Amino acid sequence: MFKINLGDFMLIRPRRLRKNQKIRDLVRETILTKNDLIMPIFVDENLKGNEKKEISSMPNQYRFSVEGAIEEAKEIADLGIPAVILFGIPKHKDEIASSAYDKNGVVQRTIRGIKEELGDELLVIADCCLCEYTSHGHCGIVKDGKILNDATLPILAKIALSYADAGVDIVAPSDMMDGRVRAIREILEENGYDDVAIMSYSAKYASSFYGPFREAAESAPKFGDRKSYQMDIGNAREALKEIALDIEEGADLILVKPALPYLDIIRMAKDRFDVPIGGYCVSGEYAMVEAAARNGWLDREKVIYEILLSIKRAGADFIITYWAKEVAEIGLSQE
């Protein structure tokens, strides 16, 4: 009789579940789909008609006119991507970011145009900040070289209200002022916009990965830096405190920015909080991959897929990425 000696072979061989693509697909733990993605759109008030302008540090990414942004949103919706996030570049900048809450501002007109064309077929998120609209490029009111927290809150609230008046689905404060979520939630409730959600950039780090975005949005600070309000890159527990405060103040969704260097923060937040959590795959991450790919140093499509999958695997429920259209159009795979 044949006898099995358990010492002669391995009972557990993880490679059995890797031997071909079908079995790998069957047991894959994390799957990336277009429903996970949000596409950014830069809307430039200085552009007319269907004019668009390529962003030099972000190949294949553009600033659009209002009309062009509406057409771009229609293309995005047709691809099955569920949401866009809008960033505005105004004609006029001043010390108090007055163009940011103008009812006929560049973002407000774009929101109305998208909603008139698409209704609920596409979620419209609007970034809520001052930096693109201030003459000094900071995310708050400045006095004597200091960024004032409490003086900034009413302006952020006015911006959010103007977006809600235009028909936005979600407002996304990215300024990192203390108390901004409460200020926004209160003004929305007072004006009957209880169904407008807040996606707070709760853990937004003072990162070096934002450089290309600041060119795209013309939002670089004219003096100093943003380290007095954006988070220190070495801190993790502080991120959890920021997230907890924003949820307590009324945030419906929270965002970690950047995503790839802060996957640990996404994972910690996912384990701790019961709200949808997103990661922003930022301009520097995009530019880094595109530059390396142009030099033939890596397999572009596989790297994009791996980056986005890693963000989801870390715990992100949604991902803001400049590759959203491409992923939806052609699909990407690790194989």
UniProtKB/Swiss-Prot annotation:
Zn(2+) binds at residues 129, 131, 139. It holds the Pfam family ALAD. Binds 1 zinc ion per monomer. 5-aminolevulinate 2 binds at residues 283, 322. GO terms for molecular function: porphobilinogen synthase activity; zinc ion binding. One of its GO terms (biological process) is heme biosynthetic process. Pathway: Porphyrin-containing compound metabolism; protoporphyrin-IX biosynthesis; coproporphyrinogen-III from 5-aminolevulinate: step 1/4. Its EC number is 4.2.1.24. Its cofactor is Zn(2+). The active site is at residues 204, 257. 5-aminolevulinate 1 binds at residues 214, 226. GO terms for cellular component: cytosol. Belongs to the ALAD family. Catalyzes an early step in the biosynthesis of tetrapyrroles. Binds two molecules of 5-aminolevulinate per subunit, each at a distinct site, and catalyzes their condensation to form porphobilinogen. This is Delta-aminolevulinic acid dehydratase. It comes from Methanocaldococcus jannaschii (strain ATCC 43067 / DSM 2661 / JAL-1 / JCM 10045 / NBRC 100440) (Methanococcus jannaschii).
